[in-house]
């Protein structure tokens, strides 16, 4: 294919054209803050384009059973066994999607359900225009619970890394 696509449960979704400057600036700042924290730790941060292959939990992880391939804006993976030359096979521990008007519905619906079902422990939705970050965490029932919606002047604690927070003023600066 000439265009970038994501495959979600066997259904093809066109990805947005190359992200704009603001999206890239926010993504860069988030990756930078995570990378400083993750230095010399077992978890690694990756940003799009980076394939995350999510197998059907009822089937094997063989390529012919992969019906979902997504490229989250940012993902953190703490299990090195999930990493291969093609990306990540299995659920990352943490995912961030930076929404645009073209992707907001998919990120709030299809990807929300997909990441919840796949076992992504923490999911952030960043809204550049409103300067908000919505944080969901898996609860004991393996369902997402809304932790909070954070504004640009707040720090966002990273649930999977106790004691570490992202500074939103820096993320939304500029």
Label every PLM stretch briefly.
Residues 1-174:
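Gly/Pro/Ser/Thr-rich low-complexity, intrinsically disordered segments predominantly at protein N-termini
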């Amino acid at each position: 294919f000439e265009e970038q696509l994501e495959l979600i449960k066997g259904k093809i979704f066109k990805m947005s054209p190359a992200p704009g400057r603001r999206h890239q600036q926010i993504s860069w700042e988030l990756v930078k803050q995570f990378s400083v924290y993750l230095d010399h730790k077992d978890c690694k941060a990756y940003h799009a384009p980076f394939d995350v292959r999510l197998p059907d939990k009822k089937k094997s992880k063989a390529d012919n059973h992969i019906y979902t391939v997504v490229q989250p804006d940012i993902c953190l993976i703490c299990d090195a066994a999930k990493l291969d030359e093609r990306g990540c096979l299995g659920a990352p521990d943490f995912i961030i999607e930076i929404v645009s008007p073209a992707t907001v519905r998919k990120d709030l619906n299809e990807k929300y359900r997909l990441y919840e079902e796949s076992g992504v422990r923490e999911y952030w939705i960043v809204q550049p225009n409103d300067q908000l970050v919505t944080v969901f965490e898996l609860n004991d029932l393996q369902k997402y619970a809304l932790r909070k919606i954070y504004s640009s002047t707040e720090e966002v604690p990273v649930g999977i890394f106790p004691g570490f927070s992202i500074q939103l003023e820096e993320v939304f600066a500029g």
